[in-house]
Regions:
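Short, acidic, small-residue-rich periplasmic hinge/interaction motif at the N-terminus
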Residues: 20-69
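Extracytoplasmic beta-strand/coil segments of soluble accessory domains associated
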Residues: 44-61, 77-119, 141
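Short acidic/polar hinge/loop motifs at secondary-structure boundaries
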Residues: 119-147
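Periplasmic-side early beta-strands and strand-to-turn transitions of outer-membrane beta-barrels
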Residues: 151-152, 164, 172-173, 181, ...
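Conserved C-terminal beta-signal and adjacent last beta-strands/turns
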Residues: 195-197, 240, 448, 539-633
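Membrane-embedded beta-barrel scaffold of Gram-negative outer-membrane proteins
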Residues: 287-299, 334-337, 398-399, 403-405, ...
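Gram-negative outer-membrane beta-barrel transporters
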Residues: 366-373, 464-465, 469-472, 490-572
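Surface-exposed extracellular loop regions of Gram-negative outer-membrane beta-barrel proteins
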Residues: 383-385, 397-450, 468-490, 529, ...
């Protein structure tokens, strides 16, 4: 029935598009960003100010709107696969593990994820519920992925990296877009977005979208019962004045259900509202942002919780001669209620209100010629460990088309309710003894990272990007066995990681562009004297040693695109997941200005494969084909 509905919708769009004239200026031409355009891209995530990608003293990758369009991605995790050095693994249904530089777990807790400056990780466990982080993909301007610590400007949880999703201005999305897709395993997105102008200075857009995913199979061939239905709607209103003042308000609401192995369904809902104002005057720029976020999540017999977040942040940038200052302050409040949905898994206390305060300062100094030095720190106070300091020192030297950089940084992951308040009984038990408990004395996990990198643009057709790092981690989470008592969460593990990351982009011909990336990770775990960790560190990391990705974009004609994405992931050691390689492909055709049709094939090399193992019965992901139509008018 869903497939029939999708095909009917595609037919309606086709017949309507043939009768419509596209809005002038609303249609992007088939194109590829040149190498020059790629290295000149402006980014903001590394230092919270605008700088050229080629001038950033950090390891950073940008996923452009063009990359997203040509990938056929329909969700954020699918889009993040395009970042060459990110480890993106599908855990179950709509749930993913996303990490950089190690420590991949299904509840990944060392990455900071932002959508238009709004933090989306859960303070319950410091990870991201990826199934509820959705955007209208065509509204994304770019995704900036910074690898390595970002705590000096972004604060806690920016331990191994920062993912910053930045959407387009409202003025850039005028007109109407209808996006419809149907495939062998997924229906959707079915989405509509409309934008316009209220006055010469005020623009707006609004959207709605739904998607439906069928359940997958376990390795045994049994039904995983992880089907997923999700709907979301949102808006943005933006004012841009000639005096350098920009202000916008945007918000989203969503609701969805996801199947469980038990045959029941988890219920998900929430919404957010964000407002930002910025003013540029001479060499100064001020920004103030506030947002409210509400989430509700019910997993039958396990968890039923409500979380409300309020965040206020202000920053100021000041360029004075050879110095470029950025400083600011912020406040965040979390109100979390564990409403209870079963006696086996709960938090004690049931309710907790958390307050976090922070200030940061960073200064880049132009020392001489192409040599720049940046130093700064974030100072935060949280309710679990008190005062935390996260400093960084970075240096960069640039000459013509070469750039060399290095950095030393410290970052922390502060405790969560999972670490301090968790109580867990045996499944099915109502009065039995606790099996696992949080620790009120749980400390912050921390890392001291040493990084270096090199970038070069070879003529106009090739660019290369190299980075290396050594990370020292202390006070990592363990599960300590205690005879006659519940297992206790504690900080008795340490780690040393080393890695090399390389990437290259080549314009092999005017009509053919190729991106290649490789990440190598070496990791060693050690334990404090007296530790009796039950998992021997397995519960905190299960990483492949090698990740290799290739993207190819071909403009076969002025209307036809042929794109491919190959990825290789090495073996995950414990629990073991065999190495796998896969290929996705897309054939795009511009039927007429304003109307694009794509055929997308995923996982072409194997009928089914496993990407991650979070339980005793891992899921498999099958070969699939989908048809997608995007119509702009």
């Amino acid at each position: 029935m869903r497939t029939l509905l999708a095909l009917l919708l595609l037919a309606v769009v086709a017949s309507s598009a043939s009768a419509q004239t596209p809005r002038p200026g609303s249609v992007e031409e088939l194109k590829q960003l040149s190498i020059e355009e790629l290295v000149d891209t402006d980014v903001t995530s590394a230092s919270r100010r605008i700088e050229r990608l080629a001038d950033v003293a950090a390891a950073i990758t940008v996923i452009s709107a063009e990359d997203l369009r040509r990938s056929g991605a329909t969700t954020l995790p699918q889009a993040l696969r395009l970042a060459g050095h990110l480890d993106v693994a599908r855990v179950s249904g709509p749930q993913y593990a996303v990490s950089a530089r190690g420590f991949s777990i299904s509840t990944e807790n060392k990455m900071l994820v932002l959508i238009d400056g709004r933090t989306v990780y859960s303070p319950v466990f410091a990870g991201v519920f990826w199934e509820t982080q959705d955007v209208f993909i065509q509204d994304i301007e770019r995704i900036e992925v910074t690898r390595g610590p970002g705590g000096s400007v972004w604060g806690a949880n920016a331990v191994n990296g920062v993912i910053n999703v930045i959407t387009k201005k409202a003025a850039a999305t005028r007109g109407t877009l209808v996006d419809i897709a149907a495939g062998t395993s997924t229906l959707g997105p079915y989405g509509v977005r409309h934008g316009g102008r209220l006055t010469n200075a005020i623009s707006y857009r609004a959207y709605t979208k739904v998607r439906f995913e069928d359940s997958h199979q376990l390795v045994s061939g049994a039904d995983a019962k992880d089907d997923f239905d999700f709907g979301q709607a949102g808006f943005r209103i933006e004012s841009e004045q000639a005096e350098g003042s920009i202000a916008f308000v945007q918000g989203d609401v969503y609701t969805g259900t996801t199947g469980m192995a038990s045959g029941t369904e988890a219920n998900l809902s929430g919404g957010n509202l964000l407002a930002r104002w910025s003013q540029t005057y001479g060499d100064h720029m001020s920004t103030v942002q506030a947002y409210y976020d509400h989430t509700y999540r019910r997993v039958p017999v396990q968890y039923r919780g409500v979380l409300n977040t309020f965040d206020l942040d202000a920053q100021h940038q000041w360029k004075a001669g050879r110095q470029n200052w950025v400083f600011g302050a912020g406040y965040r409040r979390y109100d979390g209620d564990d409403l209870g949905d079963g006696p086996g898994f709960y938090f004690e206390p049931r309710e907790r209100t958390s307050h976090r305060l922070n200030v940061f300062v960073q200064n880049e100094v132009h020392v001489a010629g192409g040599f720049f030095v940046t130093a700064g720190s974030k100072f935060e106070r949280n309710e679990f460990t008190g005062f935390e300091v996260q400093p960084t020192v970075r240096a960069r030297w640039s000459a013509q088309r070469h750039s060399v950089w290095g950095a030393v940084s410290r970052a922390v992951r502060v405790p969560t309710r999972f670490d301090t308040d968790l109580r867990f009984r045996a499944p099915g038990s109502t009065t039995g003894a606790l099996l696992l408990t949080g620790n009120s004395e749980f400390e912050s996990e921390n890392v001291v990272a040493y990084e270096a990198g090199y970038r070069q643009q070879l003529r106009e057709r090739i660019s290369i990007d190299l980075a290396g790092y050594v990370n020292n981690y202390d006070d990592l989470r363990t599960q300590e066995f205690r005879p006659g008592e519940p297992v206790l969460l504690a900080n008795m593990m340490n780690a040393l990681t080393r890695g090399i990351e390389s990437a290259a982009t080549a314009q092999l011909a005017d009509w053919w562009q190729v991106h290649v990336a490789h990440a190598y990770l070496w990791k060693e775990l050690t334990f404090d004297p007296g530790s009796r960790d039950l998992t021997n560190g397995r519960s905190e990391a299960n990483d492949p040693r090698n990740i290799f990705k290739v993207r190819s974009y071909v403009n076969a004609t002025n209307r036809i695109e042929v794109d491919a994405f190959f990825r290789f992931y090495g073996e995950r050691p414990s629990p073991v997941v065999e190495a796998y390689h896969e290929l996705d492909a897309r054939l795009g055709y511009r039927l007429r200005p304003g109307w694009d049709l794509s055929v997308i094939a995923n996982n072409l090399l194997h009928e089914r494969h496993v990407e991650y193992r979070a339980g005793t019965a891992p899921e498999t992901y099958e070969r699939s084909v989908s048809l997608r139509s995007a119509w702009r008018f």
